[in-house]
Amino acid sequence: MYIILITNNNMNKVNSGSRIVFLDYVRVVAIFMVLLVHSIEPFYLGGEGTYVASWGDALWVTFLNSALRCAVPLFVMTSSYLLLPVKGDGMTFLRRRFVRVGLPFAVWTLLYAFIPYWGTEDMSISENLSRLVFNFMPHAGHLWFVYMILGVYIIMPIISPWLERVSQRGERMFIMVWLLSTAVPFLRVAASATGFAEVWGEASWNEFGALYYTSGFIGYIVVAHYIRTYVNWSTVKTLCVALPTLVIGYIIVALPFYLQLPDAYPVNDSIDLAVRWELSWCFTTTGVALTTIALFLLFKLITKPCRIYPFFKHLSKLSYGIYLVHMFVLVAVFGYVSAWGLATPVVMLLTATLTFIISALFVQLLSLLPKSKYFIG
């Protein structure tokens, strides 16, 4: 049982039927990474906002979570690789995406508003509903992703004509400028030493700096299109580029977090402390961008289905439903697993694994219902 890698440049887009094989692997791995991220969060988020019980917990949080920050951008690149450039009418494209993504999102948002987590105290449904007028609910914070991806879909028909006309050099230039924008959060920290945290045109009356319009998740959209259109490398070249990029990216993600860890434990502080620690973990910062691109290139080496591919293909189809439902499952699972007295990394991995299995089985059952696409995607 193995994965066949093909080095022939003409074979880098081999698919099984109408599906691009490696993207199914990306989706399954990325959704598990997301579940693992959320299984790690209780080990540094809690108490007054930030809570770390021990130095050992801090290390596990640092080294494991730093390897997982690319999960969300991988989803963005997967969608972009498949959908760009948008063909046909933009409104038709948006209607299809909003039906496929937006309707299940609306269903599960309401379920999170009305149903409390297992073992939690009663919640205020009226407060939840009033919050939904403006944003996602704090206890369903994972739904931020859907707001973001819907925004990505909105921009896709707009940039598609440019992607169809721009030269390889022009697209590469945009990517380089975008990569520069991923350093802006770190530049703000450096600039704060001068007494001002704004950089390159930012001010109290203008949050749109010089690189604002080339920053954010749009970079992953363009990178995915560039890889599909122009990157037809051999296995050797891919490994020579991707592996060093992965290592460098991981160091940029993990080291700033590690260097901020305190000496005394337990740590119990406001949420602002965790927010400061997480600067290098943000999804559009340099390290996360590099690790995302590197992993995507490595997955792209998978060009033929192996024996386990049908299993991954099926899980890939369930991935959005797993994402929507998993917090209901994870909170209950973590409550049980954390009480078993296991080592910290075992609790993290076991919680994520059990959550993945239970969520997948539940979504599979839901998929058997009529019109299931409207509530699991």
Region locations from a protein language model:
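Alpha-helical transmembrane segments and their immediate juxtamembrane cytosolic regions
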Residues: 2-377
